[in-house]
Amino acid sequence: MQITEKETVQEEQQKLLYPPPSFSTKCHISSVEQYNEMYKESIESPNQFWDKKAKEFLTWFSDYTTVQHGSFEKGDISWFLNGKINVSYNCIDRHLKENADKVAILFEGDEETMVKKVTYREMFEEVCRLSNLLISLGVGKGDTVAIYLPNTPTAIYSMLACARIGAIHSVIFAGFGYESIVSRVHDAKCRVIITADEGLRGGRYIPLKEKIDQVVQHCKLVQHVLVFKNTGRPTITFNPSIDIWADEAMLDHRPYCPPVWLDSEDPLFILYTSGSTGTPKGLVHTQAGYLLYAAMTHRYVFDYHDSDVYACMADVGWITGHSYIVYGPLANGATTFIFEGTPLYPTPARYWEMVQRHKITQFYTAPTAIRSLMKFPISFTQQSDKSSLRVLGSVGEPINPEAWRWFNTNVGEGRCAIVDTYWQTESGGHLITPLPGVTSTKPGSATKPFFGIELQVLDSKTGERLYINPDINGCKEISGVLAISKPWPGIARSVYRSHGRYLQTYMTQYKGHYFTGDGVKLDSDGYYWIEGRVDDVINVSGHRLGTAELESALVGCSICAEAAVVGYPHDIKGQGILAFCTLKEGYQEDESNVIMMLKKEVRNVIGPFATPDVIVITPSLPKTRSGKIMRRILRKIGCHESSAEQLGDISTLAEPEVVKLLIEKVSKVIPKTH
């Protein structure tokens, strides 16, 4: 997959880069013809296709009677009706007969000396003990359990223990602040929280139990807090009326717990994602359909084989961690690598040292991490042996062509397959992705749909399908909103306790379609290029943040009267957070102090990862005469699209002169990159 230096960026983007023939012969899917045949069957005969895959990938307690039911319009999508299954059994028990001593979890902590290997047998015993402990606390089928843990094996045990007994887990990212945790625990009605004393990341201790102590004061429904010792430092407070030392309590329970056989459509987990209304949505994923889709995408997209060491750099607090650290790999009997640290600690060579140390074969990370590593001398990348690598993956946001080429050349050394994966929390697994050894790639394009995914490019205003037809209109590419016209097994079934919101968000904008919320370009080769959100959601380093949630946090600061938040192009993160704030009348303070206070408020309310990159203090915001903030104008200003032609008509603004002021302010704090 080498690229000659003479080619221009545009030529590189449009040129098809073919996988080496030697690579293709060893893959699960080894030719374009095989992909086309399987894809055609998945679209034209979905019941036949998914019936075969459900029997190939999953072990059932009792068989299903119907492969699929329902439609987008009715919001009653169901898969593998009346089947009985247990996700924990599929991820652990069925591997014990032949692979009990195989490493299931390969963990490396914040320091490189913190390495732990957990076999399938050991994982089975840990999960069973924790399952029995939860049962002793009255947790059972349908109960919700909040998990607020660092990226360690304990998080995996906790998820699988819930799955084993039919409890519904709600994993909360350990970077979230107190108010974000409260809203999720309250919405999910969790009676039990599983946490740890502290996390350790980038050389810094992260207080976890301390935050949960605050949460418990405001969530009276919580009855028990299980506390694992992660750092073991004597820094936390312990309330014996509610807190339980989990490590010690588990020793009082048997290392065997029979799995509870569940209906295919019983909820497996709730995972909260940002919504444009400001209130996070608790997306509900169910048992069989989700597990099948996670396992199948993991095996095919990463071309996973039994001897591989598969590594995903995500956090279990996000859907990528759920699907591609935990459920997909373990359902396939894989060795899955989990990492508590950061790519830059203690040096920017950390990722590649881990690849050499553990002989990692598949490496899945975010464009943000890649771009951050590109800033450092190439010697950090070159000093480690990366010959074990076979597949490199990108996730969380579109990868820009420059980062794609750097990843391909300096990490993959021109011999690895690169899979730029597009998907969402809602989808459960990959929607658009290359397949190693099969799909010719273009830097920056997610390429082709996965099996069962029938994509449509729609006109955003009319909802009509757009077509490329060079013979009629000379059109060689089209742009519109990305929609999907057929259900797939991994799709989230609902928003927890708010099915109407689920329908309104995804199923009503374009009748008969699932609306992704993303814009897309389709080129004449049939390759899809994701162009970003079309709703009020910002994608920062692969984390989706609702602008309303950010604005609410800013206005929660005592000095802020009004706030408007938009995304802007960011070299490292993909999108940065740009906030425009007005202050309460009469408030006078040094602007740098004001900005510091506002950033601190967002860190406390949502979490450090949501801190605005740029805050502009302004006497007023661009509004229509009816009082509506014109975020379209703010987005253009953030992108330096500030000519009269680019801004469009601003005559409807109550104070059009504020636009000039904001253009001047933004030009001083956000440099033009081109």
Curated annotation (Swiss-Prot):
Species this protein is from: Dictyostelium discoideum (Social amoeba)
Gene3D superfamilies registered for this protein in UniProt: 3.30.300.30, N-terminal domain of ligase-like
N-terminal signal peptide: none
Top EC group: ligase
Keyword Lipid metabolism: no
Binding-site list for ATP: G396, E397, P398, D420, T421, Y422, W423, Q424, T425, D518, R533, R544
EC number: 6.2.1.1
GO molecular function, one term: ATP binding
Protein name (record): Acetyl-coenzyme A synthetase
Keyword Metal-binding attributed: no
Gene name linked to the record: acsA
Organism lineage string: Eukaryota, Amoebozoa, Evosea, Eumycetozoa, Dictyostelia
PANTHER family: ACETYL-COENZYME A SYNTHETASE (PTHR24095), ACETYL-COENZYME A SYNTHETASE 1 (PTHR24095:SF14)
Binding site for CoA: R201, G202, G203, R204, T320, S541, R603
Annotated GO biological process: acetyl-CoA biosynthetic process; acetyl-CoA biosynthetic process from acetate
Family label: Belongs to the ATP-dependent AMP-binding enzyme family.
